[in-house]
Amino acid sequence: MWSRLIQIFRPLRSFRMSHSPPPASNCEEALIQLKNFGYAFDGEGVLRKVDPATGEPGKELFSYNVSDDAAENEKHYQKLANQIPEIVYALLEKNGLSRTYIPFDQPPERSSFVFSQPAKLSQSKKLLVLIHGSGYVKAGQWARSLIINNSLDHGTQLPYVRQAQKLGYDLLITNANDCTRFYNGKENPIKGVNTSVEHVKYVWKNIVLPAKPESVAIVAHSYGGSLTLDLVERFPDFFKESVFAIAFTDAAMGSPQAKNKEYLCDVACDWVASNTPLDTPVSQSKSSIRRISAGHTKHEWTSYSAIDSVFKFIEEKYEQRANKK
């Protein structure tokens, strides 16, 4: 599967450490920057140190510690991690998704973007929307620490993309942390989508609603849970009519409004970090969203570890919806 990534760019035999590489502007540039750090993804999507003798990914995994200075280690990690988004974007496109630049009235170089399949959503029979958490992650990522320390499959949304495609879903992938662009010598907020909340609101109002999908499911990780609740509050009629399943993975969110609690308790479930086996019920009140174990104790692992249970839940909810019609 990940051999396709190696075909995009094969690391050169010689490489040097770059002291201050900027974030890459495309996938090839990102892979070159990784090579300058001495790393490359192997055919299984695992980030490994490049063997100087062969120029190919070797056996050694990523090492966080490059210095006795903790600040220098973190600086090195952040610079390397800055190369991840463009690689993931390219993989989304290789898996059949297309970019849509937002807001629509801005030039691409001053816009954010989302990914979808098909390129223009229209009356989807089944639509799956993926919403990541806060921080540095961009479209297609759940946890960049897992991408760097484990594999692309562990930390990206690509396993969700592939499973959704197998099950016949159209796809929409948000990019809620992509809120600024550098020009005129500084970082500038992107007009109309300058915060995560504004980003998902714009996407919902200008892409999802006009597309008039028949049935919608959402998977939202961490702060994506709060963004989803905000959407429910802004577009309650659409949600209650069309959104049949909401899968949270260790969501960071407050209590839903009283008027939406019954609906959310019916369609939503939260897979939380827990030391109990996958799907084990976790304590909750009768008036709250169902919470079950994601099968892992760490927050950043929950989307990866719960994927089979998440899709089982979504498919069962879709079957219930279909049987009501």
Curated annotation (Swiss-Prot):
Any single GO CC term annotated in Swiss-Prot or TrEMBL for this entry: nucleus
SUPFAM superfamilies, per the entry: alpha/beta-Hydrolases
Record GO biological process: regulatory ncRNA-mediated heterochromatin formation
One GO MF term: serine hydrolase activity
Bilayer-crossing regions: none
Pfam families, alphabetized: Arb2 (PF22749)
Similarity remark: Belongs to the FAM172 family.
Name this polypeptide is given: FAM172 family protein homolog CG10038
